[in-house]
Amino acid sequence: MSTKRRYEMKILGIVAGRHGGNSEILVKEALVAAAAKGVECKMINLFDYHIEHCTGCESCTMQMGEVAMDPTKKYKGCILKDKDDMDKIVNEMQTCNGVIVGVPTYDLTPSSLYLKFAQRFLAYELSFRMEIGDVTEDPHTVAGLIAVGGSCHDWQTLTLEGMGATMFTQSITVVDQMMATRNGRPGNVLLRPEQLERAHKMGENVVEAVNTPVEERHWMGDPDQGLCPNCHSGLIFRGEPHWDGLQYPFECAVCGAGGDLVKGEDGQVKFILAPNGLARDRNINESRALHLKEIVSTRIDFMKRQGEIQDLKKHYKEITFPAI
């Protein structure tokens, strides 16, 4: 089904926390700021929708690979789309110019409700849907991300990064993000006016980004946030060879930027991008297309060699243990 943008500017708030909770309050404050600038705003709380877990069936990636090799074939989308609300939500989201997402932190990471939602995004990969005509107009969506937790950054180390990692399959550019700390009870954030002000500013930043020509858009959050100069993630890991041999000394775990860690004269460690450091930037559609080639290549190799493992597959299938 084709989707078309119907409004001059539209921002969708997405909440993965309880009704009346801190995540919802902060998203509402950001939307208030956007609405004050004449933007149409909508908000959903994921607790109000039925969302099935991704089953790992690979139907979407199998279809994508087949369509990539034979454009005459039709992409039917996620096999769960008639069983829950995911199709409705994503089709609406892919008409929005901006999204503001509020998620509580559980065990250092985004809540399972948000991840259940976001890990269904692959079947709706925006650049692929545009290529085959399912989506007729690129909304060039920008995002503001809000992580909320009862403690400081040391107990929310993976939340913003985990949220950021879910944006690229929708070709969404994150222009701002904030971490709301020490909010242990519903409504706690109302005692922290500086966090409400920051959420308000995020709403204004998202509107400003939407009004900025796509090629001129830039990071509008804290310039010193994170180590990665590309996506402002704080997660940098020692690089290892990619499937095609590319390797960097260090990489950003979120966007895939490559470079090296360098200590400056001020004693501060910085992540300096390599000359080709954005060659695998996951925010770039062409870079993700390379990943699709990797998936297709891996699948072709498996299909050629699957006869070698039939006895082993049977062996492991026949092994059983008592369940609980």
Q: Each predicted region: which residue ranges?
A:
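A short acidic, helix-capping loop that chelates divalent metal ions and anchors anionic groups
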Residues: N183-G187
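Flexible, glycine/proline-enriched loop segments at strand-loop-helix junctions
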Residues: P104-D107, V148-D154, V189-L191
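Short boundary motifs at domain starts and secondary-structure transition points
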Residues: M1-R5, D134-E137
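N-terminal beta1-alpha1-beta2 submodule of the flavodoxin-like/Rossmannoid cofactor-binding fold
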Residues: S2-G102, L108-A123, E197, M202, ...
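Short beta-strand elements in bilobed, periplasmic/extracellular small-molecule ligand-binding domains
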Residues: E40-M43, I172-A180
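Short, well-ordered alpha-helical segments in soluble proteins
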Residues: A118-F121, E125-R129, A147-G150, M167-V174, ...
